[in-house]
């Protein structure tokens, strides 16, 4: 959270953001759920992003305005237009608790929540690959955890926005403290936000 590092991300010059071991706790415990994340920023925007799973030797990547791929295969959004109860994804503690209340009360249709991976990179990879259809993160959204993944998700066709005003994630704006949801489309995003 060093302010000087955040200023670099917002600069106009070329900046590389690298998370050499995303999912550090998993890695330190010998678990295979970790990733390497890299983002390239230039002129104040994320221009490219990569997420590498060294165990599976799989790479998801995107170039701004040109699309997203995984090992050469074009990635497209999964779950767009589907009923909310057909979607599964990862939620933070507060949203997960709220979903539990919705389920217990037998309220309206609800999505399926999966357990957090404790590795943003792998969650973003599974979103891009269609294994998950939504992700939600809250507070202290560091660019090394989100810049590559959000770009890959956007380029695959997902919608990202903060709960407060639906503004999109911007890696050059420091470390935002809001609720960020990535969903197949804006309609799903709104339904998930309103749980």
Segments and roles (model prediction):
Residues 47, 75-77:
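Short, isolated positions in well-ordered beta-strands
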Residues 9-69:
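DPxDG-like acidic metal-binding loop motif
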């Amino acid at each position: 959270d060093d302010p000087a590092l955040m200023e670099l991300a917002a600069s106009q010059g070329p900046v590389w953001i690298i998370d050499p071991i995303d999912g550090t706790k998993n890695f330190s415990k010998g678990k295979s759920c970790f990733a390497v994340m890299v983002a390239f920023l230039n002129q104040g925007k994320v221009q490219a992003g990569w997420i590498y799973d060294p165990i599976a030797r799989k790479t998801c990547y995107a170039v701004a305005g040109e699309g997203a791929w995984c090992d050469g295969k074009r990635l497209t959004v999964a779950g767009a237009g589907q009923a909310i109860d057909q979607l599964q994804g990862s939620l933070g503690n507060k949203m997960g608790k709220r979903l539990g209340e919705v389920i217990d009360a037998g309220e309206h249709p609800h999505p399926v929540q999966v357990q957090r991976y404790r590795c943003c990179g792998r969650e973003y990879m599974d979103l891009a690959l269609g294994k998950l259809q939504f992700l939600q993160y809250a507070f202290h959204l560091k660019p090394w955890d989100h810049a590559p993944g959000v770009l890959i998700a956007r380029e695959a066709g997902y919608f990202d926005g903060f709960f407060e005003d639906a503004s999109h994630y911007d890696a050059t704006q420091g470390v935002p403290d809001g609720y960020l949801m990535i969903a197949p489309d804006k309609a799903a995003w709104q339904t998930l936000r309103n749980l």
